[in-house]
Amino acid sequence: DGAIDIVCAAQQDDGYLDTYYIINGKNHIFTNLKDHHELYCMGHLIEGAVAYYEATGKDKLLKAAARFADYAAAHFGAEEGKCKGYPGHEIAEMALVRLYDVTGEARYLELSKFFIDERGKRPYYFDKEHPEEVKRGHEDDLRYAYNQAHMPVREQDEAVGHSVRAVYLYSGMADIARMTGDESLYAACEKLWDSITK
């Protein structure tokens, strides 16, 4: 509980909670999704908060995680004016579904679905973040496959890239397919499962 008090004390009034940017400049929040791990950290915060709540019934950390997820949901999405980015290192996708399971707040499910649907679309979001690499003709340095962002997830049939990132993504995809009845996402999950296990 003491550690949770410390974490929650760092949370900003707007709900943002990543101490690197709180300390080093909030003007850089969500400007390097590919390499920096804000959404990854948010995902682990949510996972820990949900597990702690389920084990103890205490909701202080859960409320903090939900506020950070609300901050992200206000920033990312398909709506005009929102950022069309997605996590460079996946876990937020599956964590947001767990947060939805506990709170019943549909915006968390929608944000997870947005991250999954947006991944791999062209033009690549990471190109926008790193125009200097694109200008030099070094798009390969952005390593889309490493982040499972080389093509839309429904078109992926081979597990590639960083294995932990991949399985976090595939778990989130399976959760969304289960929750929404999305048959095309379910079919992609089956192909990726076969790629991993056969």
Per-range role (PLM):
Residues 1-198:
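Glycan-recognition and catalytic cores of secretory/periplasmic carbohydrate-active enzymes
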